[in-house]
Amino acid sequence: MHKTNFNTLLIFLFLSSCFTFLFIRCTNCSSNNFVSKKTSDTLKSIKLSTDTIIQNDTIAKKYLLGQIIPSKDTNFIAIEKKYCGKNNSYIRKEPYAAFLKMYEAALKEGIHLTILSATRTYKEQKNIWEGKWTGRYLYYGKNLASLYPNEYERTLYILKYSSMPGSSRHHWGTDIDLNSTELNYFKSGKGLKVYNWLKENAGKYGFCQPYTKKDSSRVGFEEEKWHWSYTSLSSKFLACYKRQIAYSDLTDFAGYETAIKVKLIEDYVSGINKDCR
């Protein structure tokens, strides 16, 4: 074979192998970071500045109380199964756009974020609350109605980690639960790595942990390392909630009579990390 032709062949083979390698790398990358065209097109239309989207005095009580149908509300979007642990989960578009950016950033550092829960309607929260309140659902094997016959004590126990219907931040479409709802998960190994990353980076994407460890400056719900809130919106909803919602709006569920006794609005709805207000 002529020397020139031989050198040309070597160059061709080298470039072909490089192209194949890059193609495989790009294909793998695309499969890991793929966002559907539908979601991509939707997110392009989202304006992350909320000043003209949310006006403090125009938020309806029904919205604040979770009396909504997210699938029929144009402010919401269905979460792709890739990012969520279940089907038919919805979230407001603004926090979804922010989450997608946070997801990609975390993935580059070997952190995989999964949304376990996002928007929860009044009806859904009522089902959770009354299931625990009546003993219809066993809570870690316990029938709370039998274990706590005193309604005030039962309410305090359930309120450690579950909201009364009409008082959950998940009603607003701004809050997400990530990876696990067990504190032990975040104490070591992969869970600790996830939590440390979120503490360091979630704020860059607009998210804040509302239920930090309780101390003299925070009362209400117990610590929830999995719960993250898109603050630029949730802070506005919280301000509206405290101004517009009264205990007379929280009456359509079992055990509602105890809401005022435990200071639900003052201590639980308002009892969040000051950085999230």
Residue ranges of each PLM-predicted region?
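Cell-envelope/glycan interface and biosynthesis
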Residues: I46-R277
